[in-house]
Amino acid sequence: MSQTTPAATDRLAQLPLPPGPRVPGVVQTALFSHRDRITPWLRKHYGDVIAVSVLGRPSVLVCSPELNRSVLSGEPTTFHAGEGRIQGIRNVMGEGSVVTTDEAAHQRLRKLLVPPFNGAALRGYRDMMKELAAREIGRWPVGTPFAAQPRMNAVTLEMMLRVVLGLREGPQLDALRVPFSRLVSASMAVYAGEVVPQLQRFGPWKRFRQLRERIDDALYAEIRERRSAGTTADRGDVLSQLIATQVDGDRLSDAELRDQMVTLLLAGHETTAITLSWTLHDLAHDQALQDKAIAAVDTGDDKYFEAVIKESMRLHPVFYAVARRLTHDIELGGYRVPAGYTVFAGIGPVQSDPGQHADPHAFRPERFFDGSATAWNWLPFGAGVRRCLGGGFAMMESTAILREVLLNYRLSPGRSRPETARARHVVYIPSHGARIIAHRRAK
């Protein structure tokens, strides 16, 4: 929270800056790209508040639940989440996205986005999710190794197009399936080109701009058609509900609808696919755990089944940290962090901390029944006023897909050794795509 009184300002000015490694910024950025491996060493040497330089930004990584609470539940006028995002990704999502805006603009969008993600709306998506999951999983190869992640990418993309955008079989769906897939899989170098307009006339940056234009044209055409037809109230998809939503006479513009759709794709499609890929990988490598998960599916034990997915999210966080850009100087853990710094609330460090989770590297869903997993040491959807609105959607989607897998298959490893995490952009994925072998279950 910002400090305003003269005495508080004087006290804050006397606090030291956080400690951190004394190496060139380019080296720190390179090290931070392997933050899951370097953070334990940094914590050992510098504590839970660590100064780092990331992409030329002076930054701080915090590594305890208490400090994460200070950051994630801090005053929204001081901790800017939208401004903390990488500019290239901000440009693609749009300036009217719920994740790129801050303060009053964010609060307005959040109110308008609630209806499609409340409990009643989520229940309406269940049958479509089950149908899409069964269709994709029915095409899996049997008895031969394959990478689970591309398969999970395919089914979660189809859910985004059908459940979120509400596209039906036909030219609109065909026009967006491949472009959206390419948008998600584009390299960080291509996204970085979004902040250098001159690059967009050449090579991959030009193709990426053209790709975005095709997506935008298709989305705007779909939005205009829905508005003119006036049939959104009869459809159950997220886009139609957002078009129909009004709060105190306020509604989303076409540009804002476009920004939310692209944001939901980028923020919700690959993240769910990665979580499911890790879950399948871990079940394949632990037959006793898989037996329990299959029993939970067969007996309808939804609590244990959901705990399996939550434990996968804890053990393999897709995002290692979430960023906030400071608008005021703050005190954090006895240190002064100046305005303009980016503060990273560490999800990975807390979720793998033995002080928070007993035997943290073991896959143990039971920890979600003994009270050890809390709102501040299990953070896959963030926390505070910026907690992910789509968290319930992601959990329902994940359970629908995993349930179809385990109803139909037993899994075994596609490689002799478990896979490690590999950084791709800002997410962590299985190093070999989560290779598994599917064996049909006896009915």
Protein language model regions, located:
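N-terminal membrane-proximal hinge/A-helix region immediately C-terminal to the signal-anchor transmembrane segment
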Residues: 2-95, 99-108, 123, 127-135, ...
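Cytochrome P450 catalytic-core helices
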Residues: 156, 269-290, 294-296, 392-409
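Conserved cytochrome P450 K-helix/beta-meander segment immediately N-terminal to the heme-binding cysteine loop
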Residues: 345-372
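Cytochrome P450 I-helix active-site segment
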Residues: 17-20, 25, 126, 130, ...
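Cytochrome P450 proximal C-terminal region
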Residues: 3-4, 12-18, 43-44, 133, ...
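Conserved cytochrome P450 K-helix E-x-x-R motif and the immediately C-terminal K′/meander segment
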Residues: 26-47, 221, 299-333, 354
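Cytochrome P450 heme-thiolate monooxygenase catalytic core
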Residues: 2-15, 79-90, 105-108, 121-274
